[in-house]
Amino acid sequence: MKSVIDHIVVGAAHLDEGCAFIEETCGVTVPFGGIHEQFSTHNCLMQVGQERYFEIIAANPDAPSLNRPRWFSLDDEGTKRRLVGGPIALCWVVGVPDIQAVIDKSPVPLGTPLSLYRGDLQWKLTVPDDGHLPEAGLVPAFIEWPDGVNPSSRMPALGVTLDRLCLTHPEPQWLEDVFGTLDIEHLADITGGKRSISFACDTPKGKVLLR
């Protein structure tokens, strides 16, 4: 089974702010997904292609405090400062059949494969102990779903599709080599420059670059 883009993630300081941003930018209203009790976050979800989805995520202000940092760098002070300016393309997640095999061969520390849940959904995801995103989100998180099937078919298709995932890195060849080792070099366009991630999407409002 070839590695695939499982989902892309936009972070927001507040979930309603993230949804308003996507409604204004893409012309769609993304419905509520659910609550992640293990990380005190909540999300909104929609399909962006076959077996591929889009997540808006934010800290859940009504959740209890954690004894560890939230995932996706949401407790990182640098991320918090960026989110003050509005929602951002935060990271991407790659679906694999054997998450431990990916961790074992990765030249970049990916974190621990945590067993997670939301409602009746269960999955394993790489999460560093300090909650950071490897290479500021350019190196993806990896996810393993039971039977290799993600839940995108349960989400609404609102006319938004992911066209390209675009990454810039000060050492693009290094990043390409990392991706080659991880067998994901076919999933993203890499160019040289300051670290950044963006999602090129086709939407009801036309072509949009979320960054």
Roles of regions detected by a PLM:
Residues 38-51:
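N-terminal low-complexity or amphipathic/hydrophobic leaders
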Residues 36-39, 191:
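A short beta-turn/loop motif at secondary-structure boundaries
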